[in-house]
Amino acid sequence: VNADEHLVLPLDLTDQDAMAPAADTVLRHFGRLDQVVHNGGISQRSLVRDTDMAVDRRIMEVNYFGAVALTKAVLPAFIRQGGGRFVVVTSLVGELPTPKRSAYSASKHALHGFFEALRAEEFDNGVRVTLVLPGFIRTQVSVNALTADGGAQGSMDDLQANGMDPVRCARRLVEAVQRGRDQVIIAGREGAGLYLKRWSPALYRRVIRKVKVT
């Protein structure tokens, strides 16, 4: 592996002041920046009534404001060079809110709203957006999910443990980006919930009240 082809920069998504220096470092090293993949985030497993406000705020700071700050740091370079692509890994809950994920769902909805607006604003400047909506992928996201007091859940959800292989998910993501897709759903049967919500919102709401999503 040629070390000159890689640059590793640690970045705290809650440190907004670190975004511009990080973007400048990358631009100085490579001369340009073609894509930014927003994939950092934390999930949640707690009821609204039990969750500390500090937990709600932390989830929004990491999942939403972190992505916004990094986007604003990179956007001027995209415009100067005539374009670039933001790849935004959100979640099915960005369109399908589910119990025990209220702040997490809110953060993903916020990402959808922000990047759909950005897509329209900067289209003529060559800026493109790919929204990625994964379902149950076999990663550590549920293990590290925040509980009501801000501690980690510490265990993997059953549906996560039986979810899609992350390598397969990554390949589908790369394929979607290469094809210039505006949005891609990477999910198993849980993806059917999107169609149910569109065709029969009332039925979807009845179903989600009874389904145990773990």
Regions found by a protein language model. Give the residues of each.
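The beta1-alpha1 cofactor-binding region of Rossmann-like NAD(H)/NADP(H)-dependent oxidoreductases
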Residues: 11-21, 53
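Substrate-binding pocket helix/loop in short-chain dehydrogenase/reductase
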Residues: 47-48, 55-57
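Active-site loop immediately N-terminal to the catalytic Tyr-X3-Lys motif
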Residues: 49, 96-103
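Active-site helix of classical SDR
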Residues: 71, 107
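Residue(s) in the substrate-gating loop at a strand-loop-helix junction
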Residues: 91
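Active-site-adjacent segment of SDR/Rossmann-fold oxidoreductases
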Residues: 96, 117-128
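SDR active-site lid
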Residues: 124-188
